[in-house]
Amino acid sequence: MAQDSNNLIWIDMEMTGLNPGTDRIIEVALVVTDAQLNTLAEAPVLVVHQPDDILNGMDKWNQSTHGKSGLIDKVKTSILSEAEVESRMLAFLELHVPAGTSPMCGNSICQDRRFLARSMPKLESYFHYRNLDVSTLKELAKRWKPEITQGFNKQGKHEALADIYDSIEELKYYRQHLFNI
């Protein structure tokens, strides 16, 4: 598939916590859609190795969530560094979307951008500076059309790839019910 500047790059990451100054990225997933939100390509989900001291520093919520999903075990056995994950994800994106054209798409995406800016700056700079943040629409729907907010339920698995598909489906829902498109 050739590069298309109208394609959208969706990203989700799992981290050891919410502070990009002290916490680390442990899982990255990318999906490319066309402008109508049809999936065009899915990158392999990559797990970043992090040392035990980083994993042991996670709070109870993260230890429980990432333990139940099996992600902690995957992190321990992964041989991929942050730099290797960044390089592989860039190689994937270069096949589908020209640099600097797609906003960063997802839910609460500025949190992902903060982590990328610190730990994977080349990947962060591949995106346009704008964000397509589905959580913005959720907040607007709560205020402008609260009756539709109960109509979409995310799976909430806290697994990067599943969370991307949740975000895409949520945006499709708002496109239909908030914008009537």
From Swiss-Prot:
GO annotation, biological process: DNA metabolic process
EC number, UniProt record: 3.1.15.-
CDD domains listed in its UniProt record: Orn (cd06135)
Domain Exonuclease: start-end pairs: 8-171
Keyword Cytoplasm: yes
Subcellular localization, as worded in the UniProt entry: Cytoplasm
Keyword field: Cytoplasm, Exonuclease, Hydrolase, Nuclease
Pfam families: RNase_T
GO CC terms, sorted: cytoplasm
Top-level taxonomic group: Bacteria
Keyword Cytoplasm in record: yes
Main location: cytoplasm
GO MF terms held by the record: 3'-5'-RNA exonuclease activity; nucleic acid binding
Classification via InterPro entries: Exonuclease_RNaseT/DNA_pol3, Oligoribonuclease, RNaseH-like_sf, RNaseH_sf
Active site as annotated: 129
Function: 3'-to-5' exoribonuclease specific for small oligoribonucleotides.
UniProt-listed PANTHER family: OLIGORIBONUCLEASE, MITOCHONDRIAL
Family: Belongs to the oligoribonuclease family.
Protein name: Oligoribonuclease
Organism of provenance: Nitrosomonas europaea (strain ATCC 19718 / CIP 103999 / KCTC 2705 / NBRC 14298)
